Amino acid sequence: MAACFKGQKDERPLKLFFEDEARFGRINIVSNCWVAQGTRASVTQQMVREYLYAYTSVCPETGENFSIISPVNNTEAMNKFLDAFAMTYNHYRIILCFDGAGWHTSKALKLPENIQTLQLPPYSPELNPTEHIWDYIREQKKFNNYTFPTLDAVEIQLEKSLRELNDEKEVLK
């Protein structure tokens, strides 16, 4: 990994992070759940197409994570994520692994000086540990089988869920 920074005299420690993004919105996901014996679960379903996007990077070694929420999913949003991430970890050299999404490979993508990227092979989400976070959030953090009255309510729940991940480092390792 140090080869990515070859030729640079930089004494900052090196950290490996994996990044991914996911869409959360007002279209709820109906899934299995446990209920008392002899009863039947009742879940409201809504079809409102309003979405937010969560960008998250995770260090599998330490369980550290960094997230932002964006109303769009494009290169501009990815640049904002990278800038905020680089500022938060400015005392480190970062290797950031991600998939081949268009906004990851765009010529308009601006990499901060302390971040180098590695692209994962195509069609291999199993290589990105961040992929599993989205299932965990949807199943354990009140997204499945819940309806949200507004997009702001989705944002509040998503922000709460992402903040809780900071205290759940063992889940992220």
Language model segments and positions:
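A generic "structured core" feature
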Residues: 5, 18-19, 85-88, 128, ...
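Short beta-strand segments
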Residues: 17-19, 95-98, 118-121
